């Protein structure tokens, strides 16, 4: 019996990085890309509707609809959703980021 692929959500505002993540995911049969967004607000909506088991999250979202470019706020709001599961979150950033 074949297992279901892991559902992944990408929240990334850099198009090059986003395309790199998408290309990596497309090469795998055990992973399914359920949504891609550059917005923390839309990301939370996708978590509710798509229920991803994994989230690739950019640390600094310059296109944030909430006005907050800090992804830690997204994580706090994710916790407030009180999901019946805990998605795995992978946080990404650039080497020359102010946060690194």
Identify the residue ranges that each predicted region occupies:
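Acidic, metal-coordinating helix/loop segments flanking the phosphotransfer/catalytic sites
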Residues: 22, 36-54, 61-62
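Short, flexible coil/linker segments at domain boundaries that flank nucleotide/cofactor-interacting
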Residues: 1-4, 83-84
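A short, hydrophobic beta-strand element within the central beta-sheet of small alpha/beta folds
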Residues: 76, 85-100
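Short amphipathic alpha-helix used as the core "switch/output" element in two-component signaling
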Residues: 66-84
